[in-house]
Amino acid sequence: TFGNSKPFRIKIRNVLNDNFTYFYVKKADASRIYGLEFEHLLSPNRINFLVYKDTLIEEHIAGIPGDIFIKEHLPLCTDRARNEIAKQFVKFNERCTLRLLGDMRSYNYVVIPTHDFDHVDYKIRAIDFDQQNYEGNLKVYQPHFFKENRPMVKLVTDFLEDSSVNQYKKEDMSQVA
């Protein structure tokens, strides 16, 4: 089990075409439900979930776990890709702060590569939606303060000017407005 939700993954298969999708069944609690609601309302990413009594069913978010991405994929990225990842990390950091989404260590988010004609675009999404809105320390809600995310923070300092960081923060906030 992981944490206090005791999750398990189920695979639902369409018998007509053999397509399938994964869902997670977890013990429901208020902080997790609030986190999912905020994700759905305040993020450009929508997530499907269902709550029944003390059970939560949450759709699987596909991607490469952040800790694995940092170890295995990041060293192989081009400078253009690193620049894109830095931009996405700034936006992800902003979204976590806005949604009071705490504990975004690298194993609590995924990096989603999308292949285009001549390059790969990247997005970063949370996969653990526990809220810590009772915490008075703002650092809890900012992924760049966690040591596991230092390689991502280094990308930001190496590839982005302060003016670009501010621009990306404003871009992300404008999606909520």
Please describe what each predicted stretch is.
Residues 49-51, 72-73, 82-83, 149-154:
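Glycine-rich loops and low-complexity Gly/Arg-rich segments
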Residues 116-177:
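C-terminal catalytic region of ATP-dependent kinase domains
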Residues 68-76:
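AlphaC helix of the protein kinase catalytic domain
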Residues 29-30, 42-46, 75-79, 143-148:
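Short, low-complexity, polar/charged sequence segments that are solvent-exposed and flexible
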